[in-house]
Amino acid sequence: MNGYSKKEYLKTSYEEIRKGVAKLPKDYKQLTWEEITALKKAVSTVNNVITLSVTELFVDFLKNENIIGEEQYQEIKKQIENTKPNANGYDIEYNGNPKIIAEVKCNIPVNEDSFGAAQRTGIIEDLESLQNGKGKSCITNTEDYYKFMVVLSDKEGNVKKAMRKIINGGDGIEEYNGKITITTDKVYI
């Protein structure tokens, strides 16, 4: 173990943000440069908290769907806990049995049920890296891996609608509905 705890890091960062928010001026025009950069850091921390939560929920899903067993579940959870936010590679890189890679995307569509250009580009790049490998990962050949793109869901269903616009007719991409057999030749959303 490397002594790093993602949960402890995010808990400390979040607590610093929570204490600092009350001190901000009501009008954004009165923000100092230091306050603006603190807000930017706060947004990054909140994004990391959301990504961690969604990643952990996905691992619970893998176990509940009997895609992995208890031993794999514990190994993946430990790996997630010991990986720093925004580390190179996939959000989940599991080389056990079964081999699993996953990208976790917590994008909220900027146009109600459509992603903006930068969001769309990032999602497409991640889908391609799941299919073809990623230069910033120790996994360059994804052929033997179950591949997942995990997305944040919202009450209105806008994220799902926006994702469907991207994957509609996409070769090798399928929306997981629980009624299919997972194979290594597709990316499941």
Question: Model regions: which residues?
Answer:
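Non-catalytic C-terminal interaction segments of nucleic acid-processing enzymes
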Residues: 1-16, 163-189
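Surface-exposed cleft-lining segments at the edges of enzyme active sites
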Residues: 41-45, 76-80, 111-119
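Active-site beta-strand-loop-beta-strand hairpin of nuclease catalytic cores
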Residues: 90-107
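Short, well-structured alpha-helical interface segments that form or flank functional binding sites
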Residues: 49-53, 57, 85-87, 122-125, ...
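Long amphipathic N-terminal alpha/beta scaffold segment
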Residues: 66-94
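Interdomain/boundary linker segments immediately adjacent to catalytic/signaling cores
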Residues: 1-70, 80
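Catalytic cores of nucleic-acid endonucleases
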Residues: 104-169
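Extended hydrophobic/Leu-rich segments
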Residues: 36, 73-80, 108, 182
